[in-house]
Amino acid sequence: MSKEIAKKRIEELRDLLNTFNYQYHVLDNPSVSDAEYDRNMQELIKLEAENPEFMSEDSPSIRVGGTVLDIFEKVTHKSPMLSLGNAFNEGDLRDFDRRVRQGIDDANVRYICELKIDGLAVSLHYEKGRFIQGATRGDGVTGEDITQNLKTIKAIPLRLNEEVTLEARGEAYMPKRSFVKLNEEKEQNGEDVFANPRNAAAGSIRQLDPKIAAKRNLSMFVYGLANVEEKTIPSHSESLDYLGELGFKTNPNRRTCETIEEVIAYVEEWQEKRPHLDYEIDGIVIKVDDVALQESLGTTAKSPRWAIAYKFPAEEVVTRLTGIELSVGRTGVVTPTAELEPVRVAGTIVRRASLHNEDLIREKDIRIGDYVVVKKAGDIIPEVVNVIFDKRTGGEEEYHMPTHCPACESELVRLEEEVALRCINPTCPAQIREGLIHFVSRNAMNIDGLGERVITQLFDADYIRTFADLYSLTKEQLLQLERFGEKSATNLVQAIENSKENSLERLLFGLGIRHVGAKAARTFAEHFETMDALVKATEEELKAINEIGEKMAQSVVAYFDNEDVLELLQQFKEYGVNMTYKGIKIADLQNVESYFAGKTVVLTGKLEVMGRSEAKKKIEALGGKVTGSVSKSTDLVVAGEAAGSKLAQAEKHNVEVWNEERFLQELNK
């Protein structure tokens, strides 16, 4: 076959396969058999392999998955991916309608209602009609680049029907039938199954190997335009129509409503129809349709005033409580957990539910053998709502909390003003294991690849008992563990080695000193600069620090007044673990050349590691100015958790937005 003929045939096959994909995955109306589709795809793959000069980034063959990635790169969203306020009942919907009408002086308002897909929110960027990048929502400001995995989803067009530059947003999901098939395969292979389709979709789309994502048969509904060049669309419903014309898959079950009564009827209708869909939904999204009215209504500190998400009521089911299991946390708190006959709740098989503490068991008169009502709090955490007393037979057993720790047999105590029972044995194995999990966590030593499963393996193999033991681990030891190969063992040893360079505040937080969170750990690290100086500090010296109270000061002094702790710190020194503060102190900032010099910065939302007052002081010490509102003169918005209206203002004025992690990186340069 000549090059000219090969090129022509490749183009024909691409057009043909793109048409087949659109008919099957967007229109849900296939025109050919799977066998015919596969024959054409294999012919295309063969021709492209023989003629690599004709390979294209938007070829349908890309969808089978490409090169394995090492990491997901971070992506800052051009405009923040904000969350919506919630409605839980008819009254909440009517309140929303009242607020909307008041905000626009009772002008005529039309709503558009859409199914709230229970999947993974993603953004899709197109340049002149070509798909160039896709990202997860992340924290709303910064997500992860998952472009290669999104290319495997056949409902996402690689090239649009117009050469337009835009950003579309939507929800990637796994159809129920694909979820069932995937879990059946996992069970046959002896692997852990996914709890629900949402977890399966999220787990699939974040695979470093795109070939795995390609096999998972994911799909996607696009629900909005975030940015589109040189085009004004007057309503949300028209933007959805436009997205459909471009080749995107939009949900066909949307409806425009003239009154709140019509909205409520739509909600009730889909609450009934919900089980018959081939994908999970967890509510209804209601938006003011007119874009001009949306802009007039604006946003609150947390969410837009022109939209709300109605959340379906938490599903409640009845099952039998077969036992009560106890767990011991890193601080020694003993927590009871109900063991249940397996039951499906909100799309997940539930076998356990929280009982919180002994007082709750007494208050609800929960007994082993009872039939109980179980629901998911916020559709996330299973909990026992109440006992069905009419089903009691007399054979149920009252439950009494033990007097001794289930992990180490030490006597349990109830500290003053505390509801929970606590094990105060510092050598309790359960506390040690949980403490190790905390030590390696993200806000502590942040050791990549070392999570709960691996810590448990290492602990059970008796390789680790103290934090310092982590730094003596060898590749040979790791290779003895299940699921560890040469590469993963080498990577973990290197990650542990890298953690030695962390700044003091991470180590302090990782130690798990009672009452000392990430923010307090940073305060101590910046104030004392070295671990040795903090160890020698008195209670009075600690209390003299701004925002450090008596309880925390006493806890820190008591922690370091312990020979085992001092021995641990000595081991850290011998292993080369850094125990000094590497950040910049406010007193030293005046002499530093900084990005912030001359910049106007706005802080919004909750900053976890560094409080807003401390962040303000540091920015000002670096020559920046912190203001309370976003305007055209603002250079940067730093957004923490629950950031709201200021993000919308940043988008309006085209102001750069950083999350806290990016902000801290710049401060510590």
Swiss-Prot record:
UniProt-listed InterPro entries: BRCT_dom (IPR001357), BRCT_dom_sf (IPR036420), DisA/LigA_HHH (IPR041663), DNA_ligase (IPR001679), DNA_ligase_AS (IPR018239), DNA_ligase_CS (IPR033136), DNAligase_adenylation (IPR013839), DNAligase_N (IPR013840)
Top EC class of this enzyme: ligase
Record keyword Signal present: no
Binding site for Zn(2+): C405, C408, C423, C428
Any one GO cellular component localisation term in the record: cytosol
Cofactor names: Mg(2+); Mn(2+)
SMART domains: BRCT, HhH1, LIGANc
Residues the record marks as active site: K116 (n6-amp-lysine intermediate)
Pfam family, one: DNA_ligase_aden
Keywords noted in UniProt: DNA damage, DNA repair, DNA replication, Ligase, Magnesium, Manganese, Metal-binding, NAD, Zinc
Database matches in HAMAP family: DNA_ligase_A
Functional note: DNA ligase that catalyzes the formation of phosphodiester linkages between 5'-phosphoryl and 3'-hydroxyl groups in double-stranded DNA using NAD as a coenzyme and as the energy source for the reaction. It is essential for DNA replication and repair of damaged DNA.
Protein name in the entry: DNA ligase
Organism lineage string: Bacteria, Bacillati, Bacillota, Bacilli, Bacillales
Gene: ligA
